[in-house]
Amino acid sequence: MSLQIGRTERARSPVFVFAHKRQLLHGRCSTIDNANCSTCSMKINSTCTLTALPIAALPGPRTTSHYSTAAANWCYATVAPRARSSTIAASLGTPAPSSSASFRPKLIRTTPVQAAPVAPALMDAAVERLKTGFEKFKTEVYDKKPDFFEPLKAGQAPKYMVFACADSRVCPSVTLGLEPGEAFTIRNIANMVPAYCKNKYAGVGSAIEYAVCALKVEVIVVIGHSRCGGIKALLSLKDGADDSFHFVEDWVRIGFPAKKKVQTECASMPFDDQCTVLEKEAVNVSLQNLLTYPFVKEGVTNGTLKLVGGHYDFVSGKFETWEQ
């Protein structure tokens, strides 16, 4: 049963929304009751958090009570303190709140919500943020270190090749203090490295080939991290099930050997703990896959190339490494 929501009349008090963010690549929150998710049909158990945000900061028509943005994948429910509201979800049999009643909206969604377009003002602000960020970098870093940046104009000679997750919370140049020119970096979902194949994953293969054969990197580092959504997606995959996210699920299947190992050896552990173990085991699978590339295998055998695994825990602020 899908939800139908009426329009909310303008209230004297500021209107806020409670934004519920889906925490999985797939999985769907079916019920949101004010500030608590009372029922959740996600494939793993996780706490649903709600954040109060000014409605003026959100895209889309202000009279629409339920919509989502494609980029953030949030569901929004408008809430006006003591709102004078029209009926909500007649299909649920929920009476309209009186003007003196506390308004507690309930959203029940069983089908994905169509994304609303982002307001032009928000898009302009996002682009401006990039421009101001560069200006700060140029005045505070680039212009003050000409001796550092001048050699980079002639070419690059990085010591490291780094595989890291595309997760926005994970930035190896920041967490490891890497300067421009130090690391040839590849980022993707769950920091995966596929096995050698001439007909598939050429994007990753070409990067490895160039880093090892042309740039002559000395160390290849594969870095996993805490609370990785790609790893959760991998552990949640059911054999034979249809893909909800075709590209993502096809990609994370690279880590299937690690998943099977964790499910066999850690079956009694809670899901979140299994994910933590899998974050590291998936790194080991990627390190093993690196050895299937002839030029990588040759470098390791000759002692000119080293393979290193790493794990960044941004919850506890820890970083660990191990060698293949």
Curated annotation (Swiss-Prot):
Q: What EC class is this?
A: lyase
**Catalytic reactions of this protein:** hydrogencarbonate + H(+) = CO2 + H2O
Provide the Gene Ontology terms for cellular component: chloroplast stroma
Q: Which SUPFAM superfamilies match?
A: beta-carbonic anhydrase, cab
On the tree of life, the source organism's domain of life is Eukaryota
> Per UniProt, what is one GO molecular function of this protein?
carbonate dehydratase activity
Q: What is its main location?
A: plastid
Q: Which GO terms describe its biological process?
A: carbon utilization
A matching Pfam family: Pro_CA
* Gene3D superfamilies according to UniProt: Carbonic anhydrase (3.40.1050.10)
Sorted alphabetically, which keywords does the UniProt record give? Chloroplast, Lyase, Plastid, Transit peptide, Zinc
Endpoints of the signal sequence: none
Location in the cell: Plastid, Chloroplast stroma
Q: What is its EC number?
A: 4.2.1.1
CDD domains cross-referenced by the UniProt entry: beta_CA_cladeB (cd00884)
Q: How does it assemble?
A: Homohexamer.
Q: Which family does it belong to?
A: Belongs to the beta-class carbonic anhydrase family.
Function recorded in the entry: Reversible hydration of carbon dioxide.
Tell me what this protein is called. Carbonic anhydrase, chloroplastic
Source species: Hordeum vulgare (Barley)
